[in-house]
Amino acid sequence: MDDQNKNLLLATALSFLVILGWYFFFPPPEEAPQPATEVTETAPQGDTTAPAAAPSAGAATAEVDAAAAETEITEDVPRLTIDTPRVEGSISLKGGRIDDLRLKDYRETLDDDSPIVTLLSPAGQPHAYYALYGWAPGAGLGIEDVPTANTLWQAEAGATLTPDTPVTLTWDNGKGLTFSREVSIDEDYMFSITQSVTNSSGASVALAPYGTLARHGEPANLENFFVLHEGVVGMADGELSEIDYDDMTDFDPDPRDGSRAQVNTVTENGWIGFTGHYWMSTLIPAPGEAFRAIAKYDERRDIYQTDVVLPTVTLAAGESTSANTQLFAGAKEWATIREYERAGIEGFLDSIDWGWFFFFTKPIFAVLHWLNAAIGNMGVAIIALTFLLKILVFPLAYKSYASMARMKELQPEMEKLRERAGDDRQKMQKEMMELYKREKVNPAAGCLPILIQIPIFFSLYKVIFVTLELRHAAFFGPFQDLSVPDPTSLFNLFGLLPWAAPAPDSLLSLVFIGILPILLGVSMWVQQKLNPAPTDETQRMIFAWMPWVFMFMLGGFASGLVVYWITNNVITFTQQYLIMRSHGYTPDVFGNIKSGFKKDKAEKAEKK
């Protein structure tokens, strides 16, 4: 076994193990269970003792949770319409909840008649998900003195929330406290909520403004995929936190209400909410505002909840106060979230799950996004990105392929060394190393081109899987979604026969793969033909099977990733051929293909 084949076999085996490990650690997404839904929610627990500058966990009034649990949902609750260029929905005047929101720019599937994506839905519907705001009562107040989830707010008849027209909700508790809430929205996905209260009661009162995001049960479309974070996401003074739904059930129990909660005190900048594959909702206090960020799970009601509780305010008679917060509820678009981060929301781009190799995934996606904007086709953008990556690593590739060409030139001398050494392997290895040193050849250089691909492969896979911009991103023809496996299949001759291809999650799809994985296998096979087949029978068999094993293994990967690998193989073949030729060795590709077929025929004849 010569050193060049050893290196190539080692590097390919490492790639093979990486893909096997990928399947082991990142199995296909599991179908999420459908938990029962209860029409209840819990309000956050107010702080009755903390000073305004530094909120603390504090003691809470038990009446808050008790009142919230009595929420009644009726079909004739008045609503205010939400209508912007990008979202539609409504606000319920019962509780003032933002609980009905749909994203106009996104559909559930590629079908033209597919419904648009629903992000928020009211209590009483399966998998209810909504935002709720209010005031937690402190000294001098009871739960009946502040607006709750059951409070019926007043608003101007026919009012519609648009980017140009905010809406205002009001409620008078009849005891001297008047509450108002102004809700506005921008052209994208950011709501601004200003909560105000005026004290005309003649006595001092204490209360704490809060915001809540509540989910009844786990999301219906929970993917349970290891490579993707789904659950709570938050930023606390520059530190990102991610909590899966199943981890929330392991929080320490709160003896006051039996729920399980985790409380973080944020001193200056932060946000918290729920994130999914492509959509997210987050509560965002004003920059510089201290608050408590709470992640909570109510096991009895199966409700997941995130709260933002601002410092308690003591309001003297005749005084007014207000609290400003924001609510992001929409698609995790890189450009949109980047603009919000630039506007002052610290670390908001980290709400996209860039993974452990963020130092690779972030710049790779930024370049891919720019290329897609310039070209207008994501598939072509992936091909262009592959060219740029190959240019970036070309110095290493050149050195590697030049070394491989030198190894070919040394083959006659290496054969003489083997003949002289005979069965003395130690002597042969020693003389080989002296030869490499004398000729300044690195026998391990052949590994570099393949090994360099591994971190790029991981990073690009992450980019294709988690970023919204790849969802339903078209290439050409049948390839209308590069984030999913190749939709074509041998089963129906790539659409030529009048029956459907096997479902992506069926066993048949593993056998009847699409055209892209086949092109991948062929490109790997042709790339092997730059060198003659190994003389060792075991090596030759491994090399013969390897392209086709990779073809079937990568058949279930996102088609965008397979497009990258095919392009990479074609560029690598061209580079290697030209570099080796420039160093005096011209690979006989067609001759190697012919000799391979002749050997196969000879072996079959011998067996007969």
Swiss-Prot record:
The chain crosses the membrane at residues 8-28, 378-398, 448-468, 482-502, 506-526, 542-562. One of its GO terms (cellular component) is plasma membrane. Coiled coil: none annotated. It is found in: Cell inner membrane. GO terms for biological process: protein insertion into membrane; protein transport. GO terms for molecular function: membrane insertase activity. Residues 33-61 are annotated as: Disordered. Its main location: membrane. Keywords: Cell inner membrane, Cell membrane, Chaperone, Membrane, Protein transport, Transmembrane, Transmembrane helix, Transport. It is a multi-pass membrane protein. Signal peptide: none annotated. Required for the insertion and/or proper folding and/or complex formation of integral membrane proteins into the membrane. Involved in integration of membrane proteins that insert both dependently and independently of the Sec translocase complex, as well as at least some lipoproteins. Aids folding of multispanning membrane proteins. Interacts with the Sec translocase complex via SecD. Specifically interacts with transmembrane segments of nascent integral membrane proteins during membrane integration. Belongs to the OXA1/ALB3/YidC family. Type 1 subfamily. This is Membrane protein insertase YidC. It comes from Ruegeria sp. (strain TM1040). The gene is yidC.
